[in-house]
UniProtKB/Swiss-Prot annotation:
Gene Ontology MF annotations: 4 iron, 4 sulfur cluster binding; metal ion binding; oxidoreductase activity
UniProt: [4Fe-4S] cluster binding residues: 50, 53, 56, 60, 80, 83, 86, 90, 110, 113, 116, 120, 181, 184, 187, 191, 204, 207, 210, 214, 229, 232, 235, 239, 266, 269, 272, 276, 295, 298, 301, 305, 352, 355, 358, 362, 382, 385, 388, 392, 412, 415, 418, 422, 451, 454, 457, 461, 476, 479, 482, 486
Domain 4Fe-4S ferredoxin-type, chain residue ranges per copy: 39-70, 71-100, 101-130, 172-201, 195-224, 220-249, 257-286, 286-315, 341-372, 373-402, 403-432, 442-471, 467-496
Keyword terms: 4Fe-4S, Electron transport, Iron, Iron-sulfur, Metal-binding, Repeat, Transport
Protein name (record): Uncharacterized polyferredoxin-like protein MJ1303
Xref: PANTHER family: ADENYLYLSULFATE REDUCTASE, BETA SUBUNIT, FERREDOXIN III
Chain segments annotated as coiled-coil in the UniProt record: none
InterPro entries: 4Fe4S_Fe-S-bd, 4Fe4S_Fe_S_CS, Fe-S_Ferredoxin
Species annotation: Methanocaldococcus jannaschii (strain ATCC 43067 / DSM 2661 / JAL-1 / JCM 10045 / NBRC 100440)
Superkingdom of origin: Archaea
Length: 501
């Protein structure tokens, strides 16, 4: 079996000096010494390693061997019973069952941590992604062919995880220019699909819907010209925040002036339609269509929406009461009526169909339809923690630690779940909607019975707050780097997310 993601040796570069033949390291090498899982061996004075083909994981009866976020594999020692099946099925025989403290478990499985790449003095250890990106994939084929000949085995190409790395992913959606937006929230109030989520605001936002609906041009932004006003009350009815009311034959503004930008909006990723079991949502040519008559209100779309735009909204109707009796509004006369809102029904809202109503009605031309491009991330601020891959709903992200890159596969639909949760904000975020770890309801700890003191957690922690499994929880930001890199899954991580203020 041949692996999809793996670290290989450029054979012409490995141990190229003649003095290597008489070196005391002739039976070992720097990469072997550094590998925390003993996944590298020497053959004909060249380094070879685990193929990350996944045969061990597929044949493990206890499902104790699993793929991690970097394309390698880890052994969950709580599940492993040391049966040795993984060693028996390994096509190159690198897996060995060892015993420590009365517990048997396998060694020799690559976790794709990239340590061997860093310590190689000849730059001979590289990831298969680097070869692919530099159009040198032939070196990987040669490496595998030499291994076949030396070990006298046939290595067939294994089934890889669905999705191949792509240069970029594109998506069309509206975009609100936060620098131009004045916070009137007209876009939110006019959107027929409730797809632009307003901030909770109890004030007059100067949306001027009152002025646009006044037949006599008697009001603007809640300020009334009483010489023109005919008390038709269209302004009172249309005001989205109930900022206007009638007192003594005059329409008056009863709430303060305040502006606020939308908190989030639909980016047309199509995740909701993809997860809808009833067929009430369809995503066609970048447009999202919803038919409420076949909706089960199962909330799957609400749960999966990365921007929390898909949501339940309760419809109300205003009731007018006089002396305990319901009255039609038209019969107000001189009677003193009390009004209240009564819930009518719940409905699922949110989901942009690109109708452009928001674009055509924005007074500052702050909204446009744009093509968002998501390309591989190679940023010095990226800590390669793996959070993006953890939260991705389509398993479309690869963390290439050896090259310091975050890669996207053709499974990616640019839903930006990764960007919303990224602790370093290195992934483009269209809406600016952000979630952070809720520290009070999250926890991280290390089971020291399974920690092998390999030091990988020390190496990857961006805050230097872990020392061979011992975590300083006050400094920890719950980024998950140690959790994702741990080759024995000795680190437990549970994260709850909350919207960033």
């Amino acid at each position: 079996m041949r692996g999809g993601r793996m670290i290989i040796t450029i054979l012409d570069e490995c141990r190229v000096e003649e003095k290597c033949q008489s070196c005391p390291f002739s039976q070992t090498s720097k990469c072997m010494e550094a590998c925390p899982t003993d996944a590298i061996f020497l053959l004909n004075n060249k380094s070879f390693s685990c193929l990350t083909c996944g045969e061990c994981a597929r044949n493990c009866p206890n499902k104790a061997i699993k793929r991690n976020e970097f394309g390698g594999y880890y052994v969950d020692r709580r599940r492993c019973n040391g049966c040795g099946i993984c060693a028996n099925v390994c096509p190159i025989g690198i897996i060995k069952i060892v015993e420590k403290d009365g517990k048997k478990f396998p060694m020799g499985i690559c976790s794709m941590c990239g340590v061997c790449v860093e310590v190689c003095p000849y730059n001979a250890r590289v990831s298969s992604y680097e070869l692919l990106n530099t159009k040198r994939e032939g070196l990987a084929e040669r490496y595998l062919k030499v291994l076949e000949n030396l070990m006298k085995v046939k290595l067939f190409r294994a089934e890889e995880k669905p999705g191949k790395v792509v240069e970029k992913v594109e998506r069309k959606s509206i975009k609100i220019d936060r620098d131009k937006c004045v916070g009137c929230l007209r876009c939110s109030y006019l959107c027929p699909r409730d797809t632009i989520v307003p901030d909770s605001i109890d004030a007059c936002t100067s949306c001027n819907l009152c002025g646009e609906n006044c037949p006599k041009d008697a009001i603007k932004d809640g300020e009334v010209d009483y010489n023109k006003c005919i008390l038709c009350l269209k302004c009172v009815e249309i005001c989205p925040n109930d900022a206007l009311k009638v007192e003594n034959f005059k329409v008056i503004k009863v709430k303060e002036d305040k502006t606020s930008q939308p908190t989030s909006y639909c980016i047309n990723c199509g995740l909701c339609a993809e997860h809808c079991p009833s067929g009430a949502l369809r995503f066609e040519n970048g447009h999202l269509y919803y038919s409420p008559d076949v909706c089960w209100k199962c909330m799957e779309c609400v749960k999966i929406c990365p921007n929390d735009v898909r949501r339940i909204k309760q419809d109300f109707r205003r009731l007018y009461i006089h002396k305990g009796n319901l009255m039609p509004k038209a019969s107000m006369g001189n009677n003193k009526l009390y009004s209240c809102e009564s819930p009518v029904d719940d409905r699922v809202v949110g989901g942009c169909s690109l109708c452009e109503i928001c674009i055509n009605n924005c007074p500052e031309e702050a909204i446009s339809i744009t093509t968002v491009k998501l390309e591989k991330i190679k940023d010095e601020n990226c800590i390669l923690c793996g959070t993006c891959s953890n939260v991705c709903p389509r398993d479309a992200i690869i963390i290439d630690r050896s090259n310091g890159e975050v890669l996207f596969t053709d499974n990616c639909i640019a839903c930006e779940t990764c960007a919303i949760h990224c602790p370093r904000d290195v992934i483009p975020n269209t809406t600016g909607y952000k979630k952070v770890v809720d520290r009070e309801n999250s926890f991280i700890r290390t089971d020291m019975d399974f920690c092998i003191k390999c030091g990988l957690c020390n190496k990857v922690c961006p805050n230097n707050c872990i020392d061979y499994g011992v975590i300083d929880k006050e400094r920890c930001e719950f980024c998950g780097a140690c959790y994702n890199i741990c080759p024995t899954k000795a680190i437990y991580l549970h994260r709850k997310w909350k919207v960033k203020e």
